[in-house]
Amino acid sequence: MKVSAFTKARAACSYFFIGPGLVYGMFTSRMPALTMQTGANEAQIGLILLCFGVAGMVSLAASAWIIDRFTSRTVLRLTAPLLCLALPLAGLASSPLQLGLACVAVGFTMGFVDVSMNTQAIQIERAWFRPCVSMMHASYSIGGVLGSMTGALFAGLSASTLMNFSCVLALYLCLYPLALPHMQADETQKTGGELKVSSRIPLFVLLCGFLATIAYSAEGSVAEWGSLLLFTEKSASEFTSALVFGAFCTTMVIGRLVGDRLRCAFGDFPLLLAGSALAFLGMTVVLVSPWAALCLLGYALMGLGLAPIVPVFFSRAGNTPGITPGKASAVVSFMGYSGVLVFPPALGWLAHNMGLGTALLVIPVLCALLAAGSWFFRTDEKPAACESPF
């Protein structure tokens, strides 16, 4: 059966989205092991995650200029394999300082990968007039599930973090040459020059970025503190704790796989409002339940609720008049990922002084803010993606 060019491009882009999810899933699921391996306390873990965040913010800030100069295709080709080489450095760490330096390398490369892969996804939507941003973000979640599950497997086998990271990422890189031929040229390459757009960033794009910051902050709290919450506050085993991000990402995959169809059926406002409410409910269950199994269910509900939210922001921003898809992607990525990179370390300082369970009370508040922000997406206009459904 002949495979269409769109399917090949979407599959190649999905591969690059899986990579950061895989890295992040393994890193977060093995956080208890990395903590014991380096002897770091909660305050030091918070500082280490801050190093991760600052490095990511530097690359996110530079990504718009770098991508404009060298194209998202070139940047992604270079930084995707570098990210896979950076994570095993964390497995070699034997002190908090070494772990912090490894996190700088991971955060710096991940920032470039995040912006360039989102730009590629928007380029595919624009080239074929078919939706794929939600599908791409589902691929990231699939990577997170795989990373979490392999992390739990290696933890159950009492394998080192270095062996865990190296074996899984070596297998991932075997498919790298197959994805390269199907990457997309940026719009400036297709038109032979720079696109004429306003130098000002539209307010709606900034709104999408701000709300993405809130959503990613909530996601980041699950990824970097969820396993530790179960391990330290709920008396769960390391194996059970490692399943937190996997449970979260599994339901997020389901939600994002049907995200485009849900947008077409209900519109952005009802989808964002319902998703925020479900995330609020899920995190509340996590905080009040004394049972680890019920906490996993709460995180699963939270993943399902947050699933369609960020893809809507990227899609709407990328189709906003007066700005290129690449620049819109960079703006939303920079603002959004600042949440996942900076907010969790701040939770570390709160946890050190107030306790982790108390610090995580902030998360339901963030979900409520997302529900309030959905008010700005009230419109009777059908998403453009609905005109060409999968």
Give, region by region, the residue ranges found by the protein language model:
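Symmetry-related core transmembrane helices of the 12-TM Major Facilitator Superfamily/SLC fold
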Residues: 162-180, 360-376
